[in-house]
Amino acid sequence: MDADAAAAAREMPRIVGDALTASAAEAGSAWRLEPAERGLDANVIALPAGDEIRTHTGPELDVLIVVLTGSGTLETETDAIALEPGGIVWLPPRSQRRFIAGEKGLRYFSVHQRKPGLSIRSRVG
């Protein structure tokens, strides 16, 4: 296989979204990384003013978030962390977390290693 064919057969670097435009969504996942063959999961989460993501234990993965707009609080097992635009927060694997949006809502970019997906296989025998 020549170099051109090899390049055509694999994913190539490219712009996949605009965090500022995506963060304009009202609530929920405003954007997510779509290519099927990827090693990362990434999305922009939008919470309206006063909304929250209830306390839960995170996945068996490191998660990095970058606050885009608004403000809020991240509650952990031991602390409450103020979230402001530009803030970068590391969430260790299985750490407890609760996100609470401030008066102007909260929008953040989240990225982590891709979670293993479920696959449906034929039953043998």
Model segments located where?
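Short strand-coil-strand connectors
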Residues: 36-38, 75-79, 102
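Short acidic-glycine-tyrosine-enriched beta hairpin
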Residues: 78-93
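Conserved short histidine dyad/triad with adjacent acidic residue
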Residues: 41-59
